[in-house]
Regions:
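Conserved phosphate- and dinucleotide-binding cores of soluble alpha/beta proteins
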Residues: 1-114
Length: 114
């Protein structure tokens, strides 16, 4: 789960009907992945990703979320409206979704949905 609600490299605004495809990475995704490379110029600017349609066709989906920085978006993903601007929100409609989240990632949900 990305800070903006993306899953895979399906960024906000991605069509829910998309299948596996090549995407141009957003600057925020490039910055988030630069820690894996010697310099930011080495980070790929494109990637292949499963489309949201493919993800929703999976028998089971496991969403792992950690850190306080993901708390607000996790609340939107699980309790907000299903919306292409929060791509992972479509997972609310999956028949077999398991979410594994640490205490920090759950903090907003615990505060808002007791």
């Amino acid at each position: 789960l990305g800070n903006n609600g993306h899953i895979g490299f399906n960024e906000p605004g991605a069509a829910f009907e998309k299948e596996t495809h090549c995407v141009d990475l957003t600057e925020s995704t490039i910055q988030a992945n630069k820690r894996f490379f010697e310099k930011v110029e080495d980070v790929p600017t494109q990637a292949y990703t499963m489309g949201i349609k493919n993800i929703m066709q999976a028998r089971k989906v496991l969403l792992i979320v950690s850190g306080e920085g993901k708390a607000e978006i996790l609340d939107k993903v699980l309790y907000g409206p299903v919306n292409p601007q929060v791509p992972a929100s479509i997972l609310q409609l999956h028949n077999d979704l398991t979410v594994v989240a640490d205490e920090a990632a759950m903090s907003v949900i615990k505060a808002n949905h007791r």
